């Protein structure tokens, strides 16, 4: 479910220290109910997932089209990414986050992990169109449980990047993300013990 940006901005996430010149594109509540210690599992499932294969045929086709266009136009080459076109956000990490675990490697998506702490994970991506950040947080639900929250930050690359992000926004919100959220929920439920829903100890 898509959330107002304030649902992310109102929380004291460490990512705010790194993204002052990025735009918060959107915020999503993830269908991943769990207990206080389940966040590492969520991070691992996101990093090991492949939305182009597990979500829907339409999403798979859109991902395939994007990668093909990127290949033809050179959007995703080595000179378009982190450390070449843009510096990595690891250069902005404060000392404590620099010494924290960076998080898992991604199996399918071209993200690079930035940091992983108890309730927060961030990874970045860069190409000819934009420099982006995916942020995952582990949010209490008010009843003793928790769930994941995902935020997407973007810094478009010039006028072309701004126009590109505006053009794909309706597809992301209406076609791409809803089936991805359902797939995340299915994967989460498949790995959750059916006997209980973990809650914080009282």
Where does each model-flagged region fall?
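Hydrophobic-ligand binding "helix-grip"
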Residues: 98-142
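A conserved amphipathic terminal alpha-helix motif
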Residues: 164-195
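Intrinsically disordered, low-complexity coil segments
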Residues: 51-56, 99, 106-107, 141-143, ...
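Beta-strand/loop substructures that line and gate deep hydrophobic ligand-binding cavities in soluble
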Residues: 127-166
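Short terminal or interdomain "cap/linker" segment that borders an active site or interface and mediates
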Residues: 120-122, 130-133, 142-143, 147, ...
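Short C-terminal domain-edge/linker segments immediately following a structured domain
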Residues: 59-62, 152-156, 178-186
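Hydrophobic ligand-binding cavity/cleft-lining segments
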Residues: 1-100
